[in-house]
Amino acid sequence: MNMFSSCMITALVILTLPIIMSSTKLYKNKLYPYYVKTATSYAFMISMIPTMMFIYSGQETIISNWHWMTIQTMKLSMSFKLDYFSMIFVPVALFVTWSIMEFSMWYMHSDPYINRFFKYLLLFLITMMVLVTANNMFQLFIGWEGVGIMSFLLIGWWYGRTDANTAALQAVLYNRIGDVGFIMTMAWFLLNLNTWDLQQIFITTNDNFNLPLLGLLLAATGKSAQFGLHPWLPSAMEGPTPVSALLHSSTMVVAGVFLLIRFHPLMEHNQTIQTLTLCLGAITTLFTAICALTQNDIKKIVAFSTSSQLGLMMVTIGINQPYLAFLHICTHAFFKAMLFMCSGSVIHSLNDEQDIRKMGGLFKVLPFTTTSLIIGSLALTGMPFLTGFYSKDLIIESANTSNTNAWALLITLVATSLTAAYSTRIMFFALLGQPRFSPMILINENNPLLINSIKRLLIGSVFAGYIISHSITPTTIPQMTMPHYLKMTALAVTTLGFILALELNLTTQGLKFNYPSNYFKFSSLLGYYPTIMHRLTPKTSLTISQKSASMLLDSIWLENTLPKSISYFQMKSSTLISNQKGLIKLYFLSFMLTMILSLLILNYHG
Amino acid sequence: MSMVYINIFLAFILSLMGMLVYRSHLMSSLLCLEGMMLSLFVMMSVTILNNHLTLASMMPIVLLVFAACEAALGLSLLVMVSNTYGTDYVQNLNLLQC
């Protein structure tokens, strides 16, 4: 009897301890954030033990704790599935969260409600763990909704700001639309397979799994901000930077992709759903990369970058490589969280300036942040032998050598080069050149909380790809032989993106900004999608109701048709044809005179 | 013609003169209009009753109805003038816009 399940349960229980202590005096203590951070780091270290055991011996566990209820023939219980996916994801998520908590001790240290902030972050982490280790769909749904609610609470952290409230509401609404798909899938499984347990779902056969997989795809579209349900992710940057780093780059938004990866035994035999996933992911990655090119807020560029990488993960699922998508989730967490933390460091140092047109020259002033920003961007674009290379390059190679949709492949390659382009844009505007910010700021990045957290993720960004991909069990066999031009494709398009972006930036640096062209307007207004969806539909219904109820019935038929038209017509015609002067007495007198004269003169008849 | 008809006819002529000749108030013209209608009504009723023109008995009623309409119209015009100017002096009925 080894310590696998006990260590894992211990790690998960350690995470819940600060929440339990939140009703005691400890919660009002000034050291509560430190306590939370330490709890997370201990949970990480303890969860590494089962992970090492899994890597060494391939042992998987399912822990079924507590039988909740049995509804006629279906048994619902609390069960944790500790297999390949959850065992590798849990330490990665805990490591990244540990660094983010240390970072937010620096970032939010002047916030009076910092204890509540850490409690919310910890609650989010717990629900994410519940989601990842769930063995049945009900527990997964609990985690799913939990991360949605915590996302709402954390995005609207500064609730006095209208934009933050709107963004939080937007996140909840878009996630809800995805949840409809999830519930449809649960209902289908309940009706047809009589279970919500993953094991039973995978062994019962059915000829056609199209409907539940479509529901899962809709759920993933909502949660992972694929095209169609994507506007909430850039709007979610209204929350504090640690929230953006944790939720909207590493953990919550990958929940949708994780769901599809969990159901990969169902998806491997369904060609239709794979093609749908592929095309959806390809559209997402290209569209969001185009939108990222002209944004001016540094957090929004990184948010669109996250969206683009999520589209890439969907593409990977679409070419039937769920393990590669999972590897990309794990490696992406490192450098994306680090990119967000570096942008948080820049923002805080420049006294809350988020516009890259007002940054510049930070190369000499913030050396450590500059280093990590550059390394993070290089890892994101897939520089050989950094972290991103081990997942992203493998994805591009598999897509190139597989029998897949050529259009989807082409736009994925274009999006890869655009990734390099907007990364260059961030680095060029924020770091290089002469400073464009106000010189009255004291810039100091010497806080050990900041430095240590970014340093940990920096080491992770450089080495984690190597360590993870050489430690995991071999799953799907990567393509070993391919022509050299296919092998070099990812590197070539990335280099092309870098060079083009650098040239364009350097050339147009001193030029005056003309009237924006149509392509620029398309990109910077996010493809007109939020404008159309959020404004056109309510405006249409309001206009239709005004025109039909108020104007048509009331104004036209009841008011104008008979009464006002008659009076108007009479007035117009009388003013037209009357040329009298209103000398009534004269007219009357002349009439009387004429009568009298006619009576007198014409009296003689006969 | 018998005396009754001449009497009533004279009443009609008097009211007509009163309507055509007036000095300042529009109201006096409208009042004389009512007088004309009244005398016409009486003459019509006397003629019909004396000559037993039974089928024409509805005509005084019709005359009354139209007289009422026309009185209302005249009064509304008077009210409009009075709203604009405060009085109903006929010298106000000019084309001045104010």
Swiss-Prot record, chain B:
<dbReference type="GO" id="GO:0005743">
    <property type="term" value="C:mitochondrial inner membrane"/>
</dbReference>
<dbReference type="InterPro" id="IPR001133">
    <property type="entry name" value="NADH_UbQ_OxRdtase_chain4L/K"/>
</dbReference>
<comment type="function">
    <text>Core subunit of the mitochondrial membrane respiratory chain NADH dehydrogenase (Complex I) which catalyzes electron transfer from NADH through the respiratory chain, using ubiquinone as an electron acceptor. Part of the enzyme membrane arm which is embedded in the lipid bilayer and involved in proton translocation.</text>
</comment>
<dbReference type="InterPro" id="IPR039428">
    <property type="entry name" value="NUOK/Mnh_C1-like"/>
</dbReference>
<feature type="transmembrane region" description="Helical">
    <location>
        <begin position="61"/>
        <end position="81"/>
    </location>
</feature>
<dbReference type="GO" id="GO:0008137">
    <property type="term" value="F:NADH dehydrogenase (ubiquinone) activity"/>
</dbReference>
<feature type="transmembrane region" description="Helical">
    <location>
        <begin position="29"/>
        <end position="49"/>
    </location>
</feature>
<dbReference type="GO" id="GO:0042773">
    <property type="term" value="P:ATP synthesis coupled electron transport"/>
</dbReference>
<keyword id="KW-0472">Membrane</keyword>
<comment type="subunit">
    <text>Core subunit of respiratory chain NADH dehydrogenase (Complex I) which is composed of 45 different subunits.</text>
</comment>
<keyword id="KW-0496">Mitochondrion</keyword>
<keyword id="KW-0813">Transport</keyword>
<dbReference type="GO" id="GO:0045271">
    <property type="term" value="C:respiratory chain complex I"/>
</dbReference>
<keyword id="KW-0249">Electron transport</keyword>
<keyword id="KW-0999">Mitochondrion inner membrane</keyword>
<protein>
    <recommendedName>
        <fullName>NADH-ubiquinone oxidoreductase chain 4L</fullName>
        <ecNumber>7.1.1.2</ecNumber>
    </recommendedName>
</protein>
<dbReference type="Pfam" id="PF00420">
    <property type="entry name" value="Oxidored_q2"/>
</dbReference>
<keyword id="KW-0679">Respiratory chain</keyword>
<keyword id="KW-1133">Transmembrane helix</keyword>
<keyword id="KW-0520">NAD</keyword>
<keyword id="KW-0830">Ubiquinone</keyword>
<keyword id="KW-1278">Translocase</keyword>
<comment type="similarity">
    <text>Belongs to the complex I subunit 4L family.</text>
</comment>
<feature type="transmembrane region" description="Helical">
    <location>
        <begin position="1"/>
        <end position="21"/>
    </location>
</feature>
<keyword id="KW-0812">Transmembrane</keyword>
